């Protein structure tokens, strides 16, 4: 039986992963000269209407966009603009493709053309507003931001940009009133606006007002890295170092590693003098774009957020966290070399340099260049002891099957954490998996139970520990309880529903297994493992024709090395997966209390 790789299962430990859906367009044309002379042929080609050329460019651009080539899409959309019907619509597409390909200057040129053609698209107006702010044309920026119709997401960005424009022209008080007038009453939208309000107060030196805003947001459980960093800076600069460290450590535990947060935490802990960063209007405006875009990226599986990261960087080229997320968006779209190019522009002086090197290593690995990835990883580790980078590289080692190196590096991180009185459940989870892969189940089990004690409510962890026990025939009631709870927490997560079904299968309850495995395949129809498991369940319930269909389908989905022969053998003789029963267990690790609330 093939299970998920550690990299796929440990969502909290790896870089943010997204799938970009793409369609394929088959376009075939054929023509024959039919014996035309050179003159006849020339007349035919010269007589081709300009509109036909435009539609040709439009189709090429559409195909390029569908097949994830925004640079070619932008080029051919631009060629189609002047002569095609519905010109402004094509110009809008050309702008999106230009920004998606990272060509801001071309994007501005196309946005101007689209505006001339009468486009009222939000992205056109935002692009022109950003350019006007960048070059100091305040009146043009005001017109684009205040005389345009925006949906909720773009309206939030437009109001943030306008607020920083107001700071520059009318002062802080006017900007704060402007933001207050735009509050929606929805905490999900207003928290970003309130953080922006605090940053504006801080930029003007109104630190008491800024702290009041930040304290209120923190107590409401709002967590925004740039705002939390500013909050901690203010506290530390006033001598409240313990409170600042408490906030930064809580952010790390609840949200995860952030390079800027980690650097600030280290500086405060080392007793360094903390300098409060006062944002310029351009830097603030860049954050007004970046913050909603980062939130969008965490909630969607498309590449729209990448367009906004490019706009933010046009205003503040030093906003390296935007480069990091932009590159991640490119990697999600399998545009590996472009992602590496974006990351290569992060300088060594940046807090995100180490993170960027880890991302480069991952991009190389995912594009099939594992040796280059390992070389970059080794170089990065030699250059920096950054904890976030170490975690990225440990993940990389697991992905390429170097479990011993992964285990050693994770042990080093855990040991260093202990010296700072910190325990991160994700690290014990990862090391437990690596130790299990290395055949050291007792130590792996100890790590996994430690992770459970620290974090009893993570669906991925509950699923992994529960399935591991089922697979070994140990603590079966406890194991099934964990898997069921994971499935209740994540009912639309295919691999968790698969685990629930496969656990029932291993225990001989084939009818229940079939129900869950069918649901898992509905959720993840392109997964070879899930289709393979469903085939086994069908076979055991007498549905042998359907079983063979699922196994054949699994073979078309690129199963892992070694799995193809096993699946092909089942097409001849059926499955041979042994049932499990409660195994004899020794003293072993102490199980935690029942996981049911």
Which residue ranges define each predicted feature?
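Hydrophobic residues within membrane-embedded alpha helices
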Residues: 5-6, 20, 316, 473
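C-terminal motif of bacterial Sec signal peptides marking the signal peptidase cleavage site
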Residues: 28-30
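N-terminal secretory signal peptides that target proteins for export/translocation
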Residues: 1-14
């Amino acid at each position: 039986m093939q299970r998920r790789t550690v990299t796929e299962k440990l969502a909290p430990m790896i870089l943010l992963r997204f799938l970009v859906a793409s369609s394929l367009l088959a376009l075939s044309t054929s023509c024959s000269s039919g014996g035309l002379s050179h003159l006849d042929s020339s007349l035919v080609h010269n007589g081709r209407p300009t509109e036909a050329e435009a539609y040709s460019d439009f189709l090429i651009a559409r195909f390029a966009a569908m097949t994830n080539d925004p640079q070619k899409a932008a080029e051919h959309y631009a060629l189609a603009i002047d002569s095609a019907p519905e010109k402004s619509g094509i110009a809008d597409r050309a702008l999106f493709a230009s920004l998606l390909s990272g060509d801001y200057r071309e994007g501005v040129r196309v946005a101007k053309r689209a505006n001339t053609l009468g486009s009222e698209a939000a992205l056109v107006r935002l692009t022109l507003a950003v350019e006007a702010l960048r070059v100091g044309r305040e009146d043009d920026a005001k017109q684009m931001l205040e005389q345009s119709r925006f949906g909720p997401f773009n309206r939030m960005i437009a109001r943030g940009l306008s607020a920083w424009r107001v700071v520059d022209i009318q002062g802080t008080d006017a900007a704060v009133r402007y933001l207050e007038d735009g509050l929606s009453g929805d905490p999900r939208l207003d928290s970003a606006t309130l953080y922006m309000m605090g940053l504006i107060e801080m930029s003007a030196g109104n630190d008491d007002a800024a702290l009041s805003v930040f304290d209120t947001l923190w107590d409401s459980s709002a967590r925004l890295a740039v705002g939390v960093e500013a909050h901690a800076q203010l506290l530390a600069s006033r001598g409240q170092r313990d409170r600042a460290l408490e906030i930064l450590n809580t952010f790390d535990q609840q949200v995860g590693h952030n390079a800027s947060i980690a650097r600030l935490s280290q500086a405060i802990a080392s007793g360094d003098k903390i300098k409060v960063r006062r944002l310029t209007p351009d830097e603030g405006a860049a954050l007004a774009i970046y913050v909603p875009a980062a939130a969008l990226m965490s909630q969607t599986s498309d590449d729209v957020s990448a367009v906004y990261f490019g706009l933010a960087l046009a205003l503040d080229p030093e906003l390296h966290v935007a480069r990091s997320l932009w590159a991640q968006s490119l990697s999600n779209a399998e545009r590996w070399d472009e992602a590496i190019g974006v990351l290569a522009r992060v300088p060594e002086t940046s807090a995100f340099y180490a993170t960027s090197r880890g991302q480069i290593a991952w991009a190389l690995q995912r594009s099939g260049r594992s040796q280059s990835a390992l070389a970059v990883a080794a170089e990065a580790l030699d250059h920096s002891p950054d904890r976030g980078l170490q975690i990225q590289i440990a993940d990389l080692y697991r992905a390429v099957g170097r479990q011993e190196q992964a285990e050693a590096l994770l042990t080093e991180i855990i040991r260093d954490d202990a010296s700072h009185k910190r325990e991160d459940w994700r690290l014990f989870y990862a090391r437990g998996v690596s130790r299990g892969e290395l055949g050291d189940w007792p130590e792996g089990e100890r790590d996994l139970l430690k992770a459970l004690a620290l974090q009893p409510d993570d669906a991925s962890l509950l699923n992994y520990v529960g399935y591991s026990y089922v697979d070994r025939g140990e603590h079966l009631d406890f194991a099934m309880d964990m898997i069921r709870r994971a499935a209740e927490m994540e009912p639309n997560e295919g691999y968790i529903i698969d685990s629930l079904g496969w656990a029932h299968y291993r225990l001989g309850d084939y009818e229940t297994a079939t129900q869950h495995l069918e649901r898992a395949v509905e959720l993840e129809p392109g997964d070879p493992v899930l289709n393979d498991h469903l085939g086994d369940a069908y076979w055991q319930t007498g549905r042998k024709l359907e079983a063979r269909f699922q196994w054949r389908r699994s073979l078309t989905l690129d199963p892992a090395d070694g799995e193809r022969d096993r699946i092909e053998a089942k097409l001849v003789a059926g499955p041979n997966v042994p049932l499990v029963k409660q195994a004899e267990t020794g003293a072993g690790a102490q199980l935690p209390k029942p996981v049911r609330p």
